[in-house]
Each structure stands twice: as C-alpha cells, then as structure tokens.
A protein has these predicted regions:
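Acidic/His-enriched low-complexity segments
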Residues: 19-334, 460, 475-477, 493, ...
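Bacterial Sec-dependent N-terminal signal peptides
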Residues: 1-30
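Structural detector for internal amphipathic alpha-helices that build alpha-solenoid repeat scaffolds
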Residues: 605-609, 633-645, 655, 664-679, ...
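Amphipathic alpha-helical scaffolding segments comprising HEAT/armadillo-like alpha-solenoid repeats
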Residues: 613-623, 646-658, 678-692, 712-725, ...
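Extended alpha-helical scaffolding segments
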Residues: 797-875, 879
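Sec-dependent signal peptide cleavage junction
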Residues: 19-60, 854-896
C-alpha cells in the first residue's frame, strides 16, 4: 500500500527480544505432564501499585486454516448492500477442534451450514458391475453465534488436521451500517464501498470497490481476517451487463443470465492473504497492453481516460521485466491489472494481480505527462508488493515493514534503473525527510509488538525508515549478495508468511555472516545515529585525525555499529577508507601526505543519520565539483542558498543552473539566484532567458520563467508570458498565466476565459487563485466545473481556494448553490474532505452571512432610533436571513 498521496507523508521502531510463546492446555487435552515438586521458602512480595504489563501484540494463533473461499455476490445499489453466499473449505490447522471462528463485520447472517465431502460409488447403468466414483456433499445446518463481528460455529464433532469440511454462509453485507474506523493512512475501514451508487452525482461514475488492508475484507465476506492466513479463492459476481468487473486471478467465464444481467467468474488458484482479495465494479473501460511472458497486463479506467491509459501505465511491462530479472524471481501471478477508483480511502493498494489506485494518484492526460508522470513511483511501489507483501507476506502487522519497506525500496530501484542515480537519490531524500519529520514526533521500533492500533503501523517508520535501512543493508553486503539474499528470501517464503528474522537468516545464509548486530540496532531498536564529527590535519606528521562521537540519547537509542566510507581528497586524488564506528567516542587517524582539500564522510551517502560536520566554503565548492553523488551536491547547494552573494558561490550557481545533470538542482540554482537577480540583472536576466529557451526539461524552463516574472518587467517579457500560454507544457503555461495575473489581473481575467476548459490541475489552480482574488459571482460556474477534476485529498486544496472565492460572492443564489456543492463534497468517505467542506461552509459562508445579518441589524436599529424608513433594509435583511438559514440547514445535514 502506498500512502504518500494520502499523508502522507506519511518513522522508527522497537522490539522485545525475549518473548516466549505459550500454549494453553485445556482440560480435555489427553496428556498431562506433572513437574516434580520442589519445596521453597515463602516470600511475601508487596507492590505499591499494580504492575502494568507491556503491550505485546502476538502473531495470530492458527486454530483453523481456510484452504479455499468461493463467493457468490450480487449488489443492491440502492441500499449499498451486498447479497452474498460464501463457501469455505476449512481444516483444523494442527490441533483437533470442534469450533470455527470467523470474522464477519456488519452482516446479517441468513444461514450457516456445514458439508462434508463423501465419495460414493454409483453403477454406470442399472445392473452393471462397473461403477463411477462421484464426490457428493452432505449438507446440514449447524448452530452458531454471531456477535462482536465474529461468527462462532459449532461443527458438531471434532475434526483433525487431516480432515476437511465445508462451511456455507448466506449473508447480507451492510458496510454503511458498520461503526466506521480508520486512521490517517487508511481513512476508513468499511471494506466495501459503494461510490455514488444511485447516480445522484452526475460528475462521478457509480462504482463499487473494496479495501481489505488491514482487516476490512471481513466486512463483505466471512473469513479469518488476519495476515497469517493464506488461501485460494474464486468469486461469482452478478452485475448488470453495462458494468465491467475485476477481481484477483483470471476471468474464466462470463455467463449471460438475462438481457440485462450476467455473472462473471473470477478464479485465483494461487494462495494469498484474505486482505488482498478485491472486487471492482463499474462502467470502466478495460485497456489491454502487451502481455509479459504470456500474462495479461491491463488497465481499468473511466471512459475519459481510456485514450490516456497507456501513457499513464505504459511502463508496467518494463517494470515487471526489470523486477523479475533483478530479483531473480519471475513475476509469480497469473496476470497484472490496475484499476483507478474514485473517493479512495488511501493512496493505492496491492491487491494480488489487481492493484487499485486512487484517481488523484494516477489520472493524467497525455499532455500533462509531458511535465512528469506523477503516479510512476506509486505504480512501481504497488507492483513490487506483488513479490514483497503478496508472494511473501508479513506474518503480523508488527512485521509490516517486510511489506512496506521493500515496496518503498522498489520505488528506489525503479528510479535508479529508469531515470538514473540522481533521480533515485532525490526520491530517497524525500523519503528520508519524511522519516526525520515523523521521528521528531515519536520514536518507535521498526518491528514493534507494542502498537495500540494496527493502523498505527502505517507510518514513516514502516515505510520510509525501513526503505533507508534496506538501502544500507544493500550497501553493506554489496549488490550481488543483496539480490541473491532477496531471491533466497522469496524462494523460502513464497506463498507463506515471514517475520524479520526470516529476512536476516536469508542474508546470513548467502553472506556467511552473523547479521544480528545490524538487525538488532535497526529493526529492533528506536531512533537513529546522531554524529558529531571533527577533523584536524597535522602537516608536520602528515596525519589526518577524525573524531566521531555518537550523541544520540542512549536511553532511547542504541550505540550503533556503523560501517562507513571516508573519502579523502588530496593532491588531485581520492583515497577511500572504510571505518567502523562502534563506540560513543571514536578517533581515527590516517596518513595523508598533503593537506586534504576535502574529507567526505559517508562517501556512499547511504547512512541514515543526523550528521554535524562543519565544512568551509572552499570545501563545499570543491565537494560540488569533485564529489559527484546527489547527496554531495545537495549538501553544497544547501550552503550556497545562504551565500549567493559570495562571488565564488554566485559564479558556480550560474554554472549549476545550466549544466547540473539533475533537473531539480538546475531549478534549485535558479531559485537561489533569485536572491541576487535584481542587483545582477545584466547577468541573470539573459541567463534565465537562455535557460527558458534551451533547457530540455519543462519544469526547469518553468522555473526560469517564474524567476523572470518575480524579478523583471518589460514588454519583451509580457510577450513571453503570453506566448507561454500556448506551450504544450502545462507547467510553463501556468507560470505564464500567473505572471500575467500578478502584473495585470484585468488582462488575466480575459485570458482565463480561453483556458477554462483545460483539464490540467496546474492551470485550474492558477485560474482559481485569480478568481479567489478578483472574481465575482459570475465565476462560480468555473469552480463548479473545476471541482469535477478533483477527488480525494485534492479536494482539501480545492476547498481552500473555493472558500476564499466564496467570501467575494454577494448573490444569495450563488452561495446557496455553493452550500449544496459543499454538501455533496462532504458526502464521501474521506473524513478530511468532510472536515474541509464543513469548515469552508462555516467560515466562508455562515460566518460571512451572519456578519452581513449582524451589520444590517445594527444599521436598521440605528435608523429606527432616528425614525428613518427601514422598509428596504428590512426586505434586504429577510433575504440575508433566509439565505443564511438555508446554508445553516445544509450545514447541519453534513455535521450529522
């Protein structure tokens, strides 16, 4: 599951090393072992207060094992309900049992029956001695108790692990009647979602989709809803002929029942976890791409995006080939499909063979992709999950990082392969920043058994920090050993569950090393290293001395063992040294015949640590020019940001803006040069014009145009901004429009009319920003149309600008229409969007019109005291009061 579009961004980890698993022995157990008696002195222990036990979230105990789940489902769109029948093939996991416990949330259970398969020999024909063997099922009702979202089924006899039985349950799933939960990462846990089921919202395609992680699929089919479970499954989905369906595995049959109704039969014949089962239903258009090794690759999108589907998802086949080769493990599943859903409650979800993306993650037109494919890293993340998370799964949510850190690192691997090392390191730096931001809020272990809510595991620790740790492990063991270890881990744990120690054992088997030290400090402890580094050079003795102190709080974090490279640049050469930092205070000396130009700590820029190592301007200039890694150049640019007026830095920044191989560093240099752009107009303006004309990247060109607009005026530039409106790049066009809006709002209002039909969100934001500052009631229709382009968390940004605009509106019909739009906006499942709609309605409509009412009341009272005529004002007051009342009534409905 990818959370970045949701939050997140959405940290660090701890573990209890000495825990033992115990089995309770019941009175009915056949064996009782008596320990020898030992007489001990009596010791009286008195506690001042009760001793609190630490929370320990144990891996789920396996009592029963679902072998196969078969579902028959149809849908009542009007009621947002699923009518279902489930047939579960079950056996006791190991110990004999007379009971079966299933998770089933918010259901109406119609019946529960048990069947046993029996073999019966029947004569081929009357009087014949030849027989045919048939499997027959003897079905009978069983007693059960359904409470607390669980079905407790009495099997009527004891079954052993060698016996299989079948449970059939008829039920109605009522997801909208479930007491809804969720978290910042996954905002709802209803499991089954009917989006605009009655079609009341003409802007949103009616659809059904599911979200199983963490344990929400039991809201639409009875199961053992836990990551320890693995099963095969199939599903018969009865729908109207106009709808397309998607589920796990292969569509083996589609049977027409009537002129309007058909049943699709999907079969998943490889085992996976219940939370990975999915359904999608709607008037989706299926776009089929070139297969990979005979396996179908397909994309399910709304009609408007059918022509763009291959532009959005077209690298999927290349990704599958890359990951299959890199991991030494061919893509293991039957097909790979991706579907895009409206009002999705997270970012994306790695359902086996059928990933679901929120529309705000992936939907772009082919023209928008000119400026960059915004969903590419998410597509890579979810695909990598098909190996790490689906093929080999974490055995418990405590070990979630085995799923999410690898999917996060899958993003890095793809960026590295497809877009180069700079792109990968830049992506990694964003992830590292997300971890450090959350680590300032809390400190937890990577693998943690003491979480209060399993949803808490979906954070920047399981994702971001875990991905950084995997990268450090790769750098420590080397690429060959790293990928060989991953191959072994996947082979040993395929179609099974694993914990962090299984990963360690795979690496140890390949490398021959004991890696407990690495896993103990990174997987089973909190925090990260904080290093204070100082250097001295003795020219007489030709000795370089480095002192490196670990300054992290050792009451919270461990004393780390850190293998790291030191690159020493002297006399035109680079000399690499490996050191091991193991103590709180460490001193290293090196023989260096010349005074170093630069001592570069962590030459691979792979260490997850806060590092305090002061460098001079000359060292950082040298570092930028000679230490080529992304992290080296980024560190230098960070220093240059506050020193742009230094002549050496200034001259180098001009070179960076043109020549740095990484487009974001070129843009960053342009941004830094803004500080001196006005005082250096004769040099900077021509430079920016040249970059705008020649740079190959549209984002860099847009940065140059933005800098020109921020610093200079002139007819030549005005013409340039108007020309920019005709660029294919929306990034450039929006910067041109913003420049016109800042210089000449009246002209921008006219130019906006020609751009109002553009689907680009960058253009839409620019126009909405203009209208929020200069618009009138007449521009409200644009906001209504623009809203159709936003969904999910994007609606929060839309709401912010919409609210500012509504303060400018004066007509009752406009604000009542706006209140209705906000009511519709609040009708989805995203609680953050609901909050945004409520806040806009209260702050920008109710409070504004309350203020109008109060002001007019005061004016009327004053005029009455002066015996003035207030007939017109009283009439105006009635309009305002009635308007406010209608808004308040709508507000009350969305607050319920």
């Amino acid at each position: 599951m990818n959370l970045k579009p949701v939050l997140f961004s959405f940290v660090a980890f701890s573990f209890i090393l000495a825990c033992t698993h115990t089995k309770k022995i019941s009175k009915t157990d056949s064996m009782v072992i008596e320990e020898p008696s030992i007489r001990l002195d009596t010791i009286k222990i008195v506690a001042d207060e009760p001793i609190k036990k630490d929370i320990y979230k144990a891996t789920n105990t396996k009592l029963s094992d679902i072998i196969h789940t078969k579902l028959w489902v149809s849908f009542d769109w009007q009621k947002s309900q699923l009518i279902g029948k489930a047939e579960l093939q079950v056996k006791p996991y190991f110990y004999p049992t007379t009971m079966l416990y299933l998770n089933a949330r918010g259901m109406e259970i119609k019946s529960v029956k048990l069947a046993e398969k029996q073999v019966k020999a029947l004569p081929i024909k009357k009087g014949s001695k030849s027989v045919v063997v048939e499997d027959i099922f003897i079905e009978k009702p069983v007693t059960y108790k359904y409470e607390n979202d669980s079905i407790k089924i009495n099997l009527g006899k004891e079954y052993t692990s060698k016996e299989t039985y079948y449970i059939t349950i008829e039920y109605i799933s009522k997801p909208n009647e479930i007491k809804e939960g969720g978290s910042g990462a996954i905002t709802s846990d209803k499991g089954l979602y009917f989006i605009n089921p009655t079609g009341v919202d003409e802007d949103k395609m009616p659809q059904i989709w599911t979200q199983g992680e963490t344990q929400s699929n039991s809201a639409w089919f009875p199961t053992i809803d836990n990551p320890t479970e693995k099963m095969t499954n199939e599903i018969y989905m009865t729908v109207e002929n106009k709808y397309t369906t998607l589920s796990n595995g292969i569509l083996v049959d589609s049977k027409k029942n009537t002129e309007l109704i058909r049943t699709d039969h999907w079969v998943m014949d490889l085992p996976h976890a219940p939370y990975l089962v999915m359904m999608g239903v709607g008037e989706f258009k299926k776009v089929t791409d070139e297969p990979w090794n005979g396996k179908e690759i397909s994309y399910y999108v709304e009609k408007e995006y059918e022509q763009h589907a291959k532009a959005i998802f077209g690298k999927t086949k290349k990704m599958i080939e890359f990951y299959s080769t890199r991991l030494g493990t061919p893509y293991p599943w039957q097909k790979y499909a991706q579907i895009v859903a409206r009002d999705y409650v997270s970012g994306a979800m790695e359902n086996t063979t059928a990933t679901l993306h929120g529309d705000f993650v992936c939907y772009q037109t082919t023209r928008e992709i000119i400026d960059g494919a915004k969903g590419e890293s998410t597509i890579a993340h979810e695909l990598f999950h098909q190996w790490f998370g689906d093929y080999a799964s974490c055995e418990s949510w405590s070990n979630l990082t085995l799923n999410e850190s690898f999917a996060t690192y899958g993003e890095y691997l793809w960026e590295e392969f497809e877009n180069g090392k700079d792109a990968a390191d830049d992506h990694s730096a964003d992830s590292r920043f997300g971890y450090f931001a959350q680590s300032a809020q809390k400190q937890v272990d990577l693998v943690r058994f003491d979480y209060e809510d399993r949803e808490d595991m979906f954070d920047a620790f399981s994702y971001n920090k875990g991905g950084q740790i995997i990268h450090m492990l790769r750098k420590y063991v080397g690429d060959d050993a790293f990928f060989a270890s991953l191959k072994l881990y996947l082979e040993k744990n395929k179609f099974k569950t694993a914990e962090a120690h299984d990963l360690r054992l795979a690496f140890e088997e390949i490398t021959g090393q004991d890696l407990n030290w690495f896993f103990n400090e990174w997987y089973f402890a909190k925090g990260h290293p904080e290093l204070e580094i100082k250097k001295t050079y003795d020219g007489t003795l030709n000795k370089l001395t480095l002192t490196i102190n670990q300054t992290q709080d050792l009451k919270v974090s461990p004393l780390y063992k850190l293998p790291v490279y030191i690159d020493i640049y002297a006399n035109g050469k680079k000399d690499r040294k490996q050191i091991w930092i193991e103590d709180a205070k460490n001193t290293f000396t090196f023989s260096v015949n010349y005074k170093p130009d630069l001592v570069n700590f962590d030459g691979e820029k792979q260490l997850l640590a806060k590092v305090d190592f002061a460098k001079t301007k000359q060292e950082l200039i040298f570092q930028y020019k000679n230490a080529a890694k992304w992290g080296d150049r980024d560190e230098a640019l960070t220093f240059f940001k506050d020193n742009s007026r230094d002549i050496e830095v200034y001259e180098l920044l001009k070179i960076i803006a043109v020549n740095d191989p990484w487009r974001k560093f070129r843009s960053k240099a342009i941004s830094i040069l803004n500080e001196v752009a006005k005082e250096k107009e004769s040099e900077i303006k021509p430079l920016l014009l040249s970059i705008y004309a020649k740079d190959v990247n549209t984002r860099v060109r847009a940065s140059a145009l933005k800098a020109l607009a921020a610093n200079y005026k002139g007819e030549d530039l005005n013409a340039l901004y108007e020309q920019a409106l005709n660029e294919q790049s929306y990034a450039i066009a929006s910067e041109g429009f913003d420049a016109i809006a800042n210089l000449n709002p009246e002209l921008a209002m006219k130019k906006a009319l020609a751009l109002e039909n553009e689907p680009s969100k960058e253009i839409i934001y620019s126009i909405m920003d203009l209208y929020s500052k200069n618009g009138t009631d007449a521009n409200h229709e644009y906001f209504k149309k623009a809203k159709k382009q936003f969904s999910g968390f994007e609606l929060m940004s839309f709401g912010n600008l919409y609210g500012k605009f509504l303060k400018r509106c004066t007509k009752p019909e406009t604000v009542i229409d706006a209140a209705k739009l906000l009511t519709k906006m609040a009708s989805g499942d995203n609680k953050y969007v609901k909050y945004t709609a409520q806040k806009v309605m209260k702050d920008n409509l109710i409070n504004v019109w309350q203020s109008k009412e109060d002001k007019l009341n005061s004016q009327i009272e004053k005029l009455k005291k002066e015996n003035q005529d207030v007939t017109t004002l009283t009439s105006d007051l009635k309009v305002i009061t009635d308007t406010k009342k209608q808004i308040v009534d709508l507000y009350i409905t969305i607050k319920k």
